[in-house]
Amino acid sequence: MEGWSQVALVPLKNSNNNSNSNSSSNNSSNGVLVQDPISTVTTTVFDSVQNLVWCGDTSGYVRSLSSVKTSPYSIQLYPYTKFRTNTLNQPIIQILSHREGVLSLLNDQLSIYNRRGVPRNAVNSMSFKESNGRELFKDLKTMSFNCNSFNEIVVGTELDLIKVDMNKSNLVQQFNHTGKVAMVKEAPKLLALASSTGSLELFDPTSNSSIKTFSAHNGYMSDMDIKGNYIATCGNSIRPKRYHYHQAPEYTADPLVNIFDIRTMKAVAPVAFPAGVSSVRFHPKLPNILIVTSAYGLIEFVDIFDQTNVSVYHADMSAATPPLPPAGSSAAQQQKQQQQQQQQPHLSGLEISENGDFFMFNDGFSNLHLWSITNSGTLSKNFVNFPQEIERPDIVNGPSGVLGGGSGSGDGAFIDIDADVPLSVVGMPYYKELLLSNWPNDLKFVKEKARLPEPIDPDLLSIFEKQQQQKISQTPKWIPYDSLKYGTCNIPEYYSLTSQKDTQIPKFLSEKNGGQKQRQKSIQALEDSIFQCQNDEKIPNCYSRLQIQYSKFGVKDFDFAFYNRTQEYCGLENHSDNSYINSLLQLYRFQSVFYNKVVHSLSNEWLPNDEATIETNPEGSSILNELAYLFDMMFKAKSRNVKTYNFSQVMNHDKQAAKLINLNELMNLNSHEVRELIIAFNNYLLTRLSMDFRNQFNFNFDLTELAYEIEVRGRGHSCPIYDKQMGAMFSLELITPPHNMMSKMSILVNPNTQQDQQQQQQQQQQQQQQQQPTNLANIRKNLNILTYLEYSMNQYKTIPCTQHQHFHPHTLEIRTSITKLPPVLVLNVNLTNEEFRIINSLKQWLVPDLYAVRATNNGSNRGYSFKPSMPVSGDFKKYQLLGYVCEISHQVDTSRTGGHNLVSFVKIKDEWMFFNDYLVIPIPEEEVFNLTYSWKKPVIVIYQEVDKMDKVEPFRHITHFQGNDSILYRDHFAGPIRELYQREYTLLTREKEAPQPGTLVAIDAEFVTLKPEQLEISYNGQKKLVKPKELSLARVSVLRGGREGINSNITGNNNDDNNNISGMIIDDPLFGEAFIDDYIVHKSHIYDYTTNFSGIEPNDLDIHKSSKNLVTLQTAYRKLWLLLNLGVIFVGHGLYTDFRTINLQVPEEQIRDTADFYYKSSFKRQLSLKFLAYVMLKERVQKGNHDSIEDARTALLLYKKYVELNQKSTNEFEKMLNFVYEEGNRLKYRVPEL
């Protein structure tokens, strides 16, 4: 439902007949008329017969507005009739459109008027002869037509439910119902009643009994609508009493629209609307579309069967402002107007026209907002499909003597142009625009100043003529529009939620204000809707391509935790290069043997630093090392997100991976190219790991290695050709068997009982007798991955022999078989789209377990056969499905680029987990094995060998490092060593200063910018950060800081994890002395050195031009990684950004961040290191360029000061922090200049 916009804003001016009528309405500051608070609009409705809009107000007036289409693109509403329904100034409660007129409901009266304002009938308590009727007809609340009747009106009162026949208005019937009826609506054969307590009751007027009652809302029901067999309700809930028991109840709008099905008498899935629902309406022509609004102007069109199909608009509620009290008003009127000035405009009275082309609402100040669809180019002028003509008043001529001016008399008198008669005596229709006669006095219409129409562009004429010359059968619907030549089109702003399907809660942490309870409700709403889809073509939300959003606070403000439903498994960010590898890395991360071998390779040291290596590998690392670091960070991160930047950078500089680089998140690839890319990376990764193990540690990495044998034999008696070759590969390419072999192979791989086999053989014989081809549907239940695996591992084909063909024709047999299976079986499913359709048609292609049985032929091994169940005898291996990488096609046409992404399913501790970049959620097993969707294609499948107890090797995580840590105690420079360079650090000594758990070290890092940030600038100048700037580590300094001890008198500030553990023990004479000060070598282009903040000068990081001793990135990273795994505690200022850019996942218990300690949440401002040093330490730092050693030492001293203040008393630091912020307010948080 795109293309809606506001087409008219009508101020409903009050015109009470009193002495103050001239001052009963005012103009607001923006020109919109605002209603006198004495009389405001209470109800609105579209007419069901004519193009009219009806309004009722608090003074008992009913007025109508007629639509006039002023142009193809605009519409106006003009007053048509206005009449008063009573003399007691009772407010109009409700209006209904009737075929004979309009019905209006007051507190004790029901009346009907025709559309010209002439009364037809009125029913009140005095209309009934019986005293019972007089007692019933009071305190009226709501009304509706009875089921399938336009003459019978059902009215809800304070205590009863009654029925009035307008043809027999002196009789009233009481239904068998007690209790207050707040709203009543007609449904097919039933009445829907809303009570004051929030319940929904279905009442049968024929049997005069209640059918069903639903508990819809906790408080009261604010709106209700019915379409077909569905009822939609919205309401409010009672807030808990916060102060005392007798407190008046407070209500809050419910964030859900409840939907009830009349046929099943059950509630169906509600519609989420976090802004709070105030009104709800079904679309009259599209019963699946629901229009939901909030009191603050948010409008949403949502499909109740597919709630991801949403269109969102926002009404401009700022157009109405309450008027100032008019001069001469009474004190009561002025008091009411002053109360209204304090109120905010709110959306109410939502109504939609019968044809569904318009809807309207009131803003609380009697301004009527009319909306319509404008994306078709023109507006509809009708509110109903076939409107009746509106009766217009007759035009009466003025007095003949006046109009005639002496030239005529009577009707049709003519006014001469020279007659001395003012034209104002004729009268004018109602108008709001400036008249043509309103021109300046000095304006003269002369030929020289006349403006001629713009000529038609010749390009458009030539296009039209060319189309005519081509003899097009019909006139084209449009001609190409050149926006560069003619400017932007007048197109309304477009709102869509397609790219952001997870909108149940705010994206940014700074936007949250609902607390933990609201967050839990939002997460539950997301979990309920994540797999909701009505057909196979609609892809659930969890498979969507995710996009990280950036606020003004950066990526730290993005709520990654919302997308992770676990406590121990991390997600991977997708805004780095080559992010398509995330799904495969998650899969290998949870294969324990693979993980253990890779991660524990870090126990040994491999740090190449020669110039030849740095020219091609500036990071001085390898795929093995970076994958090991990444796996360890993924474990330590728990449920926090992790970046793959370091791994991707090493991959980018590897020449063997040149064809695997992807920098735009697969947007330039189609479905088949995406699958080929991830399979190629899988082969590269396994091959590269094997090479790295062999080159670095002389170790054979055969975890996934399959041994194969190729045998070539001549079939002729005299053909001597025979050859046998052996080989190995790290993954197996699955091949689809030919159709004529599928039937036979499905029986061999998936044997049933002997009786079933005989039945299948009989069926095959019958098919062969009838000479019909093999029907794949008959064997579909037996086909699965084992069929493909059996065929792929045991290849057999024949080719003509070319060497001995002249003797007699014969062929050569070529047999390929797998002779050895690895512990981890990696299968590449590189099939075509047509072959995937076969998999989609199978009942269950993947199997959770498989058994590999050694096949024998005359005593010799002939490969393997695969069974879905345990063999009775023989040598076999059991494999269990670990998971698979899956390609998701978001486009029906898979040949189109973009719209494809990769996800993975992994079995962890007997539970299936789903990984989609940083989205991590548990997933049902049925969804994992369901491959019947055309958009879901398995690409890489991994099975792992298990023992008889279905166990695999346990994970061996690195919690306390015990390997080679010698890099901490020596220098390891890259390239030439500058002897003249003066070192500013002193290396650690292993005997006295070996890092231990609890050792304090101060750290600070400086970065340079490799790539600038990417911004999206809208037409109005607003900027949106699409991708942040790419930073790289340039310098890191680490200082000695003593040890941390336990002190029960110390309490942390704003960091509960640090309570009672903040004591410092300083026994090192080199306290505050640096032991690491590394400058990182860079070979790639540096966009910005940011010298003012980093202190890095140009050429400082160039291996040939730098005056400093440089190290590779892996050398610096390994030092920090060793400190982390040795259990040291890092002290610094703003460590979140440093560790995130370095890609180091440090547990919170190992971080002491002074930016968090010296932070007071009530001020919502973090203090800079420079300002804290000035106030707390009485020192001036960062006087020139930043120096990482100085910054780290300052943070260490600030932490020492924090500990000292907490040791004195619990309130000492709190007092000092208040003083710091007071100084900040006085100095504007800046250090005064000298």
From Swiss-Prot:
It is found in: Cytoplasm. A divalent metal cation binds at residues 1004, 1006, 1138, 1191. Its EC number is 3.1.13.4. Belongs to the peptidase C19 family. PAN2 subfamily. Binds 2 metal cations per subunit in the catalytic exonuclease domain. This is PAN2-PAN3 deadenylation complex catalytic subunit PAN2. It comes from Lodderomyces elongisporus (strain ATCC 11503 / CBS 2605 / JCM 1781 / NBRC 1676 / NRRL YB-4239). One of its GO terms (cellular component) is PAN complex. Its main location: cytoplasm. Residues 1072-1199 form the Exonuclease domain. GO terms for molecular function: metal ion binding; nucleic acid binding; poly(A)-specific ribonuclease activity.
